[in-house]
């Protein structure tokens, strides 16, 4: 980013922070705050504020590119080593990024955002609300400002959980170490006598009802979804679909050959024939379809397990997009479009030099841009400059 581009974005950010009444987190004086500045390396950390006005004055003066705060509460948040801060508890943070979703590198920006939102909805509704029983007012949802979503669980039940307890929550959501014998149950349904007292037991493998709570019902619903999806496809398309769930060509063919109309009806009734290959295949695909990616990429420790995590401040701006870290009502999550709803800058035309071809839809406008000079609305210019696709260009 050249100097002119940096100064342009800083002016726009400064104007936003001068006029925005940013809500601070509860017990804000017990939080650590951190900042990354434009054109400067590193992070300014170990800062706390006693008054909201002190914080607002600071961000107007410094105009940071990124603003973070601690999910933890500290007795002394301003101290410069973690052991001296005296930890007092922490919110439970979930950070889903498009880069964590399999195949995201092959998707457009809009497609990646839509995919990660689907996984986020699954996390919030299926796991946090349904399985763990949190109330909606205990879940604070935000668009990250770039490529993902954050969920802050503020329930008193989680504040004192240590890292290992938080890891158990992650393991449950990811389906780690999910046992086949918990999901699939064998039951003796008949005995065949052969003389001299010999009997052969007839076993039936049963799957849970789709309306059961937790992973049992979740697996059942997913199995039925897969079956309904593949039963109307021709053989090659069905094999391709099964392979998309991580199944090999050979195993996919075996599944297709195994599933008859009669077996499909039996599975719908909660019964599946004794076939270890079939049950393992469907369990694997169900896990891949349901499990939510929670680990933070290449970082050493997943965000959710970190009891001292720094997370983006809600309603601050993201320095690489210009988008707002936008709060989202749970009821509106399905319809939330970050490329429309998190855009806060205006339509004033700005002259830029586009450095590489761009194809993106923002604020319901589709832009297909080529390398060269062009006039663009502020919101798009800031987005492209932040991403490194353009820079301010004088007359």
Explain the meaning of each model-derived region:
Residues 383-384:
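Basic amphipathic alpha-helical segments that dock to polyanions
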Residues 1-144, 155-163, 168, 175-291, ...:
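Signature for HUH/AEP ssDNA processing cores
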């Amino acid at each position: 980013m050249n100097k002119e581009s940096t100064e342009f974005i800083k002016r726009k950010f400064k104007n936003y922070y001068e006029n925005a009444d940013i809500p601070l987190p509860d017990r804000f004086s017990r939080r650590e705050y951190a900042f990354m500045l434009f054109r400067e390396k590193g992070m300014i950390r170990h800062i706390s504020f006693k008054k909201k006005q002190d914080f607002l004055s600071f961000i107007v003066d410094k105009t940071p590119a990124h603003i973070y705060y601690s999910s933890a509460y500290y007795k002394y948040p301003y101290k410069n080593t973690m052991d001296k801060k005296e930890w007092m508890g922490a919110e439970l943070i979930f950070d889903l990024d498009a880069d964590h979703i399999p195949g995201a590198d092959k998707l457009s920006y809009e497609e990646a955002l839509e995919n990660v939102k689907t996984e986020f909805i699954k996390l919030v509704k299926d796991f946090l609300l349904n399985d763990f029983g949190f109330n909606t007012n205990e879940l604070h949802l935000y668009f990250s400002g770039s490529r993902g979503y954050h969920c802050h669980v503020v329930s008193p039940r989680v504040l004192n959980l240590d890292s290992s307890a938080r890891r158990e929550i992650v393991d449950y959501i990811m389906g780690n170490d999910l046992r086949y014998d918990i999901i699939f149950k064998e039951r003796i349904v008949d005995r065949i006598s052969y003389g001299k007292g010999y009997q052969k037991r007839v076993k039936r493998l049963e799957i849970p009802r789709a309306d059961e709570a937790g992973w049992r019902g979740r697996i059942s619903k997913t199995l039925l979804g897969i079956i309904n999806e593949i039963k109307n496809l021709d053989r090659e398309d069905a094999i391709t679909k099964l392979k998309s769930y991580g199944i090999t060509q050979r195993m996919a063919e075996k599944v297709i050959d195994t599933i008859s109309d009669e077996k499909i009806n039996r599975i719908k009734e909660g019964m599946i024939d004794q076939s270890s290959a079939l049950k393992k295949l469907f369990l694997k695909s169900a896990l891949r379809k349901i499990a939510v990616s929670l680990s933070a990429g290449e970082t050493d420790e997943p965000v959710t397990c970190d009891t001292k995590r720094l997370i983006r401040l809600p309603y601050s701006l993201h320095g690489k997009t210009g988008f707002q870290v936008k709060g989202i009502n749970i009821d509106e999550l399905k319809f939330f479009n970050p490329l429309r709803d998190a855009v806060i800058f205006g339509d004033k035309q700005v002259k830029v030099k586009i450095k590489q071809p761009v194809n993106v839809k923002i604020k319901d406008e589709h832009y297909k841009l080529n390398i060269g000079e062009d006039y663009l609305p502020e919101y798009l210019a800031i987005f492209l400059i932040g991403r490194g696709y353009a820079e301010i260009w004088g007359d």
